[in-house]
Amino acid sequence: MADFEELRNMVSSFRVSELQVLLGFAGRNKSGRKHDLLMRALHLLKSGCSPAVQIKIRELYRRRYPRTLEGLSDLSTIKSSVFSLDGGSSPVEPDLAVAGIHSLPSTSVTPHSPSSPVGSVLLQDTKPTFEMQQPSPPIPPVHPDVQLKNLPFYDVLDVLIKPTSLVQSSIQRFQEKFFIFALTPQQVREICISRDFLPGGRRDYTVQVQLRLCLAETSCPQEDNYPNSLCIKVNGKLFPLPGYAPPPKNGIEQKRPGRPLNITSLVRLSSAVPNQISISWASEIGKNYSMSVYLVRQLTSAMLLQRLKMKGIRNPDHSRALIKEKLTADPDSEIATTSLRVSLMCPLGKMRLTIPCRAVTCTHLQCFDAALYLQMNEKKPTWICPVCDKKAAYESLILDGLFMEILNDCSDVDEIKFQEDGSWCPMRPKKEAMKVSSQPCTKIESSSVLSKPCSVTVASEASKKKVDVIDLTIESSSDEEEDPPAKRKCIFMSETQSSPTKGVLMYQPSSVRVPSVTSVDPAAIPPSLTDYSVPFHHTPISSMSSDLPGLDFLSLIPVDPQYCPPMFLDSLTSPLTASSTSVTTTSSHESSTHVSSSSSRSETGVITSSGSNIPDIISLD
């Protein structure tokens, strides 16, 4: 009967995982909530379980609670041991070993409080025996077999404190533990030699004392992980922790990013005086943490790159085999890939690769630059492949020999294409041919005679949407022999450098050779010059008489001198034809306008003015 009660208490203390293991061992259903699992296990026990099931229950219980009270026969001994355990007041006992044995916690529990272990033991005297044998909380091992992940930028020189469990010693939420360690003279010498003074009185060390915290799990190498409400003091001085990382979504508690802690600046660099570390944290149900202290040497990205090169370059045949595997036709697939294009630009720096690198775990051929990748992880160690966003640890990096050959063979291309047989060819950009548009457009040419041309096009009513081009710089005889399409007459205004008289309005054929054009419909020419920008209103040309060569029209028109251009027109030297009319004013301080219109001759009229350095050219196309 006593064995039954003992087994019943053991089963009642099991968690869901232990209950599932027990029911699975007995061949019972192990799905459902904890209450259902517990009822099945107790029913299994009452119905008379086999000795093998009883042995399994005791095995699970010993695994669940490795250290429990064997009995309460000597209650006075338990009381005295508990009182002596809780009475420790000094944070560090004098007989502590230097190699990391911690002292008792500074927080104590009142012996007769209802929540204290002693009170619970005293109150159990009048209760049944199975209630007195309730197990105590599990105590994790002092030095668990915890392995931390290697840090590529640090070489471990020595272990100062082996991984030690942060044991919960009371029922209070906030716990505190103390650890001590000492440095040897050789370790102190190495730290002092590596010291570098920075601006502002700061000091930097390449040989560092490094504190690491992680979960006390032995299943796999652990990453750095901090408990909640962590507070670290080194030799009584508060150590600044990294800032909180932004939460992934609202409603989740912020956590600090896990990383090793460099406590060298707070360590006593002496072999005669030990160093003390105080760690306080908030306990969590189901989570135990471990701490350790190491002496490490910090490395740079250049050192890691040199080590990566010393590992050697991977044979190009491995990459060719991977290419053939990717381009091998799948008989079940309707789409077959016959070629594979790969860029020679680094996805990190957007520049040409210099040291092509990728991880062995990656399935893609695209490489990234090893130097840039190491520099990026030196600033913020993430070790994520920039191509596929998967883990790419330093230990899995390789230098691709095939890409090394490609980069050495062609230095002027940024992309290549792999064929099915593993060969490759460069992908050079195609030069687009310059195509001349079939639709004509207005063309402006500058020459020695025309310094600043400006063309104005007047279209006829018959072809308002059609725009023709007149090239004023063509001097070859081939243009004269061919009959170009019909063009309209143009009037050019240019500055004559060798004019014998200054300020004279002259009409002369242009020295620029132009194609012959046909006459323009008179209806297309405006009857007056009011459409053009002139500083005064004038009389229509048709109403002027050709026998008035010396009449000054400006004296008859009231004009404000400040709006007149500074042109001095003295004489008129141009032949008059039957269909053209010329009006010349010879005022020395006034302005005049010369208009030439011809319907029977294909020539250009040039109005020359030396009063301004910038000529105005009007092309009527």
Swiss-Prot record:
- Tissues with expression: Mainly expressed in testis. Isoform 3 is expressed predominantly in adult testis, weakly in pancreas, embryonic testis and sperm, and at very low levels in other organs.
Keywords noted in UniProt: DNA-binding, Isopeptide bond, Metal-binding, Nucleus, Phosphoprotein, Transcription, Transcription regulation, Transferase, Ubl conjugation, Ubl conjugation pathway, Zinc, Zinc-finger
What GO biological process term is on the record, naming one? protein sumoylation
Might you give the EC number(s) for this enzyme? Answer: 2.3.2.-
| Segments carrying motif Nuclear localization signal | 484-492
Where is the protein localized? Nucleus speckle; Nucleus, PML body; Nucleus
Q: In which pathway does it act?
A: Protein modification; protein sumoylation
Q: Where is the composition biased (Low complexity)?
A: 579-610
What is known about what this protein does? Functions as an E3-type small ubiquitin-like modifier (SUMO) ligase, stabilizing the interaction between UBE2I and the substrate, and as a SUMO-tethering factor. Plays a crucial role as a transcriptional coregulator in various cellular pathways, including the STAT pathway, the p53 pathway and the steroid hormone signaling pathway. The effects of this transcriptional coregulation, transactivation or silencing may vary depending upon the biological context and the PIAS2 isoform studied. However, it seems to be mostly involved in gene silencing.
- Protein name (Swiss-Prot/TrEMBL): E3 SUMO-protein ligase PIAS2
Source organism of this protein record? Homo sapiens (Human)
